[in-house]
Design a protein with these regions (language model features):
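Conserved Helicase C-terminal RecA-like lobe
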Residues: 1-87, 92-99, 180-198
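SF2 helicase motor core recognition
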Residues: 46-50, 73, 87-111, 115-136
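Hydrophobic residues at beta-strand termini and immediately following loops
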Residues: 63, 110, 142
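A conserved SF2-helicase RecA2
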Residues: 114-198
């Protein structure tokens, strides 16, 4: 059983380059007096980023599934009212029925799944029809880059992002052609994502 060795290796990593980049970008945006939404998939990432930002003196809050509805509303309103600068959440919790586009125009995607609906819904939290012409809206996609067995650079995050873009193109084509296309299974998604890794 290598569980303890693996745990030690993971703990020895410290802060990843992806997380450093996310924190640095967030700090830059906050210093420009911009509010930021950071999208994650994993609760541990949400909590870790919040703790790191707070240690940097940046006011941040997180909304995750265990947060009661009335508390979600209060936290969202506090974000809109400027009581904190960064909202960290996930699309399972906050991707629908929340409008932040009047106060926030920067979203950082620290983690993302290959569920296109989650991506599109989360993007819509800071961008809506009816925004002022020329309104700035910016999405940032964090990516960890590794070397595969051939020492070629490889990014799982980039593979997931490219898969999402493919799905979006298929969706838009289906809308334009008024014709549904077959959808990919999770197994096909994984096969496409991992094909360049090994």
């Amino acid at each position: 059983d290598y569980a303890n060795e693996v745990k030690t290796l993971i703990e020895d990593i410290g802060i990843t380059s992806k997380k450093k980049e996310c924190l640095s970008l967030t700090e830059k945006l906050v210093n420009e007096n911009k509010k930021v939404v950071i999208w994650c998939i994993f609760v541990d990432s949400i909590r870790s980023i919040k703790a790191s930002l707070e240690s940097m003196g940046i006011k941040a809050e997180c909304i995750i599934g265990e947060v009661a509805l009335e508390d979600r509303i209060a936290l969202t309103n506090a974000f809109k009212d400027g009581k904190y600068d960064v909202l960290i959440t996930n699309p399972h919790t906050l991707a629908e029925s929340v409008s932040l586009h009047h106060v926030c125009h920067d979203a950082i995607y620290y983690e993302y799944s290959y569920n296109l609906v989650h991506l599109l819904q989360s993007k819509d939290r800071i961008h809506r029809l009816g925004l002022k012409e020329g309104q700035y809206t910016q999405y940032y996609y964090m990516q960890a880059v590794f070397k595969n067995q051939f020492l070629d650079e490889f990014s799982m995050d980039e593979e997931v992002y490219l898969r999402l873009k493919d799905k979006e193109e298929i969706m838009l084509k289906a809308i334009d052609d008024n014709e549904l296309e077959p959808v990919y299974t999770p197994e096909q998604d994984l096969e496409l994502i991992f094909k360049n890794l090994f």
